[in-house]
């Protein structure tokens, strides 16, 4: 019976490892996904303060999150099993249209009861409620625009190759249809990039600026990074970035000079500039009379960022342990915008370093996958999404450690926020699906790589054998 039980265990273990070996996507990315989700479940369960949840107890909260995790894993699995890159490429063409339409509804503050309603939350227009579901527009825009630019850069390259061969291009038909007429200049490479890349980026950032200045700057930086990954001319990118920065500074200057009378729709510009100049120091309270209105206004302003700094400081090397956080009772949204501070408080510097290594590993693995992709769209999509996820993670960490301006960026796949979590699951699903294309080449190179110290291994073993013989004498 014991032997049969052992054989059954060995058979089960064999099937498990065979299943692992047969996973076609990048295994390192899979490990990163599951590690981030594990941190998310543990951290959200522990960070949920019963004092803050009111009508919900902790188990209700964690059950909701586990359900979202299940849906997210389902999205990842569904996208992972799409084996044709053309499906992603076709859908990516709609990225700018989807972003523009959602931002338009948000910026116009559309309210059609029961259908779609723009929502004003925490002093900003950020979300749409569609048929009862809350959609965080900026999260969709980030991923959609990265994928759109991946398509545009791929389409431009294919278009130029077709024209060099004197063949009819099936891409960028709008510009090509202008060839030979008064608008012939639109068929030139610079104007094609301007129409399909630079103008969509500019429009998107301006529309995001109406709701969040910091998000507009962050999204603009990520999209410029995607252009660099795709090989767009550095000179043109520099000009486009300078134009965008000049436009932003002009809006900020006019808004501040006229006290908001010019460009009143950009009310978040004032918030953005205030956050860049803000000083979240407890010493600011010393010159105010305790109990006064000004005292409590200043206290409310610094409470969350200052408590996040306290959480990081009190975490030490190993942290307070699961459930040991005290700052979760002070920071109302610690499981969202201040998740990294909470993790460091409970898991210490060790936990913080693990989180950092996971995101850095994702960026490194994304770069490796991209370098092995033969398809231009696949390379840019994986590289762009990896930069987006890692960039947002580090932006979140900078806010939590008071080394960057205040923004509302969550920690990807860890922070609470059902819609943001699902959007990043889509991003990971695309990365894993595309990694199938590069897996065989990566595996072949890893297998071919010589082990470290291969030449010395036999010498070491021979020395050990001699020592063993001496002991036996």
Identify the function of each model-found stretch.
Residues 2-29, 42-43, 49-211, 397-412, ...:
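Membrane-helix boundary/helix-loop-helix interface segments in multi-pass membrane proteins
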Residues 67-72, 141-142, 346-363, 424-427:
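Hydrophobic alpha-helical transmembrane segments
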Residues 70-73, 93-100, 193-209, 213-264:
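Hydrophobic alpha-helical segments of polytopic membrane proteins
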Residues 121, 125-127, 240-351, 376-377:
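Hydrophobic, glycine- and aromatic-enriched re-entrant/interface helices and adjoining loop segments
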Residues 148, 249, 253, 271, ...:
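Transmembrane alpha-helix boundary/anchor motif
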Residues 188-196, 240, 329, 380-388:
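Alpha-helical transmembrane segments of multi-pass membrane proteins, especially transporters
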Residues 217, 223-236, 326-351, 408-421:
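Interfacial segments of multi-pass membrane proteins
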Residues 367-408, 414:
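Loop-to-helix entry and N-terminal half of a specific, functionally important transmembrane alpha helix
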């Amino acid at each position: 019976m014991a032997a049969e039980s052992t054989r059954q265990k060995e058979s089960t273990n064999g099937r498990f490892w065979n299943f692992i070996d047969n996973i076609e996507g990048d295994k390192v990315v899979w490990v990163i996904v599951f590690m981030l989700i594990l941190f998310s479940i543990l951290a959200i369960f522990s960070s949920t303060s019963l004092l803050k949840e009111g009508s919900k107890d902790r188990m209700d909260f964690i059950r909701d999150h586990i359900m979202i995790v299940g849906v997210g894993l389902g999205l990842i699995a569904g996208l992972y099993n799409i084996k044709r890159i053309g499906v992603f490429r076709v859908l990516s063409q709609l990225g700018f249209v989807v972003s523009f339409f959602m931002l338009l509804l948000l910026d116009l503050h559309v309210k059609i009861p029961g259908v779609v309603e723009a929502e004003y939350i925490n002093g900003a227009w950020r979300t749409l409620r569609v048929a009862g579901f809350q959609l965080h527009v900026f999260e969709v825009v980030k991923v959609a625009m990265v994928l759109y630019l991946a398509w545009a850069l791929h389409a431009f390259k294919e278009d130029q190759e077709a024209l060099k061969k004197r063949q009819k291009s099936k891409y960028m038909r709008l510009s090509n249809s202008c060839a030979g007429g008064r608008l012939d200049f639109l068929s030139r490479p610079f104007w094609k990039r301007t129409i399909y890349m630079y103008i969509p980026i500019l429009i998107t950032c301006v529309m995001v600026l109406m709701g969040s200045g910091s998000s507009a700057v962050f999204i603009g930086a990520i999209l410029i990074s995607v252009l660099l990954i795709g090989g767009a001319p550095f000179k043109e990118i520099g000009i486009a970035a300078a134009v965008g920065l000049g436009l932003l500074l002009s809006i900020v200057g006019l808004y501040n000079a006229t006290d908001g009378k010019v460009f009143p729709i950009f009310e978040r510009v004032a918030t953005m500039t205030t956050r860049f100049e803000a000083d979240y120091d407890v010493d600011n309270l010393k010159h105010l009379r305790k109990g006064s209105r000004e005292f409590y206004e200043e206290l409310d302003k610094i409470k969350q960022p200052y408590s996040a700094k306290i959480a990081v400081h009190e975490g030490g090397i190993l942290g307070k342990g699961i459930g040991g956080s005290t700052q979760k009772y002070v920071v109302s949204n610690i499981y969202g915008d201040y998740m990294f501070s909470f993790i460091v408080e409970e898991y210490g510097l060790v936990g913080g370093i693990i989180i950092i290594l996971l995101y850095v590993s994702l960026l490194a693995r994304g770069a490796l996958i991209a370098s092995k992709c033969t398809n231009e769209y696949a390379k840019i999509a994986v590289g762009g999404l990896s930069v987006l996820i890692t960039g947002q993670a580090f932006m979140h960490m900078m806010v939590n450690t008071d080394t960057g301006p205040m923004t509302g960026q969550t920690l990807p796949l860890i922070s609470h926020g059902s819609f943001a979590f699902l959007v990043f699951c889509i991003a990971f699903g695309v990365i894993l699906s595309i990694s199938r294309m590069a897996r065989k080449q990566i595996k072949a190179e890893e297998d071919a790589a010589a082990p470290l110290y291969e030449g010395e291994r036999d010498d070491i073993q021979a020395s050990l054998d001699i020592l063993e013989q001496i002991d036996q004498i």
